[in-house]
From Swiss-Prot:
Belongs to the heat shock protein 90 family. Residues 550-623 are annotated as: C. This is Chaperone protein HtpG. The lineage of its organism: Bacteria, Bacillati, Bacillota, Clostridia, Eubacteriales. Molecular chaperone. Has ATPase activity. Homodimer. CDD domains: HATPase_Hsp90-like (cd16927). PROSITE patterns: HSP90 (PS00298). One of its GO terms (molecular function) is ATP-dependent protein folding chaperone. It is found in: Cytoplasm. Residues 342-549 are annotated as: B. Its main location: cytoplasm. InterPro entries: HATPase_C_sf (IPR036890), Heat_shock_protein_90_CS (IPR019805), HSP90_C (IPR037196), Hsp90_fam (IPR001404), Hsp90_N (IPR020575), Ribosomal_Su5_D2-typ_SF (IPR020568).
Length: 623
């Protein structure tokens, strides 16, 4: 038995493979199972070119054999095996891919799904083992060979005994220490979970001897344990099956099996794309919002597979943030992986797949809104806020993508409506899309600012979430119709001549009110929007009163204030009391003015600056 050295700085490269390339030691099993699958594929390919050979898929499988006494883990396959020369060339040279060499020698086109690319997957075994033994017999050969290495001082190759072709890879596990428990890779539950997680859709059976329990023969309650060989993996991915043969239960069960959620999804999409990009995907739109969805702990992303092998549990690059609620998987052969297969190289194919998925999701939501309104409203109740964040984020870059998916409660319809539905039934003389902002629909219905708009027969959209107005400010208009808050200074309804006349006639009292309130307001003016209320607040400029409330509640509050205007109903009886007070008792006039302003603040849901002063003012009136 001859001791051989690793070729061409392979020792140094092996150290890099073991300590730098792989960040997660548990993926060693994924790599070795993928290699075993490739080895069986090569046998299948050999039989295609030789009519004297047959390939019965039922005869080919991968076996995982833990041995707790010897602390070894064996991965066996009935694949093509290796000759002595191939052992020396493939395992003696780090980063030489035997699979790529096989494809080249046999002139196999890229459509043949061999997983291996880089020739380093085998060496991931050294993440958990301090010695690896390989016993292999090549397809059609008479002799078997043993390759053995500790990953440090080269390797040995010697003749061995093996009845049939294929390969056994025996991992001699490292000793446990304070940081690592390598014995866990001998436990049945751990091996099953790793196979299901990473290699569930390998096309050949992955078998494991499983301990089970049964009632002992001849007894009623006495149980005995027995060992039975079990196929752990599913083999055929749901996304590669004909969608016409699948039922809703198939998709719903897969949703639960993958732990995307514990209830039924609202919608599923089964996508198969071939062309410039090729991928298969199953996507789900959940009905209910995850408990942590609006927290920093929530991670968006789709499970990403390459040739049925899990590459990433959550590939965030496949989903824009505003569709981050979507769950599912994507499988593609066109991905450029890095050498560890743990991460993707940033390439055009991934971007194309992501763009295509984004379009598919949007189309599905639009279809749901049009054809299944009840389901869409369920979805929107859970995730509508996220769509509105999408409009607002990135300086409105995605507003055109999302605007048709938005919905708001309507004063006229008493239900949720889309912007398209609102615009479609606008009156001919209506200039704006009107909206009102408040904590709830009930609160908005009591707002004094809505009176004039409703009297004109115009519809008002109710904004009850903190993001609503910010999103609409970014959207600016819809189908060339601008948005207008009922609390804005100019509603586009009032007669300018009448307003000007009333403000001129009451110039003195308005100036006195402004003087009494000082910098709290920017102006006092006559209101044409009020009927039953004496006063209300409106705003001028880009920052509305509601936006001020939201911004002031934020931790990094910059003290942004709306330019408040106190609007006065000159037809209200309180206004006559104001005029009398101005003529006869300036202190009482100032008191009335402050009380009316504070009343307007309370109606808007704003805090009174000095509650003690406010209660004292009320007491003065009661004396």
């Amino acid at each position: 038995m001859e001791k051989r050295e690793f070729k061409a700085e392979s020792k140094r490269l092996l150290d890099i493979v073991i300590n730098s390339i792989y960040t997660n030691r548990e993926i060693f099993l994924r790599e070795l199972i993928s290699n075993a699958s490739d080895a069986i594929d090569k046998v299948y390919y050999k039989t295609l070119g030789d009519s004297s050979l047959t390939f019965n898929k039922d005869d080919y499988y991968i076996k995982i054999k833990p041995n707790k006494e010897e602390r070894t883990l064996t991965i066996s396959d009935k694949g093509i095996g290796m000759t002595e020369k191939e052992l020396d060339e493939n395992l003696g040279v780090i980063a030489k891919s035997g699979s790529l060499q096989f494809k080249k020698e046999n002139e196999i086109k890229d459509g043949f799904d061999i997983i291996g690319q880089f020739g380093v997957g085998f060496y991931s075994g050294f993440l958990v083992a301090d010695k690896i033994t390989v016993i292999t017999k090549a397809f059609g050969a008479d002799k078997a060979y043993k390759w053995e290495s500790d990953g440090v001082d080269g390797y040995t190759i010697s003749e061995a005994e093996k009845d049939s072709f294929g390969t056994d890879i025996i991992l001699h596990l490292k000793a446990n220490d304070e940081d690592e428990n390598y014995d866990e890779f001998l436990e049945e539950y751990k091996l099953k979970s790793l196979i299901k997680k990473y290699s569930d859709f390998i096309r050949y059976p992955i078998k494991l001897d499983v301990t089970k329990s049964r009632v002992k023969e001849g007894t009623e309650n006495e149980h005995e344990e027995y060992v039975e060989e079990e196929t752990v993996n599913s083999m055929v991915p749901l996304w590669r099956r004909n969608k016409n043969e699948l039922t809703d239960d198939d998709y719903n069960n897969f949703y639960v099996e993958k732990r995307f959620g514990f209830d039924k999804p609202l919608r599923h999409m089964h996508i198969s794309v071939d062309g410039m990009i090729s991928y298969n995907s199953i996507l789900y739109i959940p009905e209910n919002i995850p408990y942590d969805y609006y927290t920093k702990e929530y991670e968006k992303g789709l499970e990403l597979y390459s040739n049925g092998v899990l590459i990433m549990e959550k590939c965030s690059e496949l989903l824009p943030d505003y569709f981050g609620f979507v769950k599912g998987i994507v499988d593609s052969q066109d991905l450029s992986l890095n050498i560890s297969r743990e991460m993707l190289q940033h390439d055009r194919q991934l971007s194309r797949i992501a763009k295509n998925i984004k379009t598919k999701i949007k189309n599905e939501l639009e279809s749901m809104m049009k054809n299944d309104r009840e389901s869409y409203e369920k979805f929107y109740k859970s995730f509508g806020r996220q769509l509105k964040y999408g409009v607002y984020d990135d300086f409105g870059m995605n507003k055109d993508e999302l605007k048709d998916l938005l919905m708001f409660y309507s004063s006229k319809e008493k239900k949720m409506v889309s912007l398209a539905e609102y615009v479609e039934r606008m009156a001919e003389d209506q200039k704006y899309i009107y909206y009102a902002v408040g904590e709830s629909n009930e609160r908005i219905e009591k707002m004094p600012q809505t009176e004039m708009v409703l009297d004109k027969g115009y519809e008002i959209l109710y904004f009850t979430e903190d993001v609503d107005e910010f999103a609409i400010k970014m959207l600016m208009n819809y189908k060339e119709k601008e948005f207008k808050s009922v609390s804005s200074g100019d509603l586009g309804i009032e007669s300018e001549e009448e307003n000007k006349k009333e403000n001129e006639e009451n110039k003195g009292i308005f100036e006195a009110m402004k003087e009494a309130l000082g910098e709290k307001i920017s102006a006092v003016k006559a209101s044409s929007r009020l009927k039953n209320y004496p006063v209300c607040l409106s705003s001028e400029g880009e920052v509305s009163i509601e936006m001020e409330k939201i911004l002031s509640a934020m931790p990094n509050n910059q003290g942004v204030k709306a330019q408040k205007v106190l609007e006065v109903n000159t037809n209200h009886e309180v206004f006559n009391s104001l005029k009398d007070a101005l003529e006869n008792d300036k202190d009482k006039f100032n008191l009335y003015t402050k009380l009316l302003y504070n009343q307007a603040l309370l109606v808007e849901g704003l805090s009174i600056e000095d509650p003690v002063d406010f209660t004292n003012d009320i007491c003065k009136l009661m004396k």
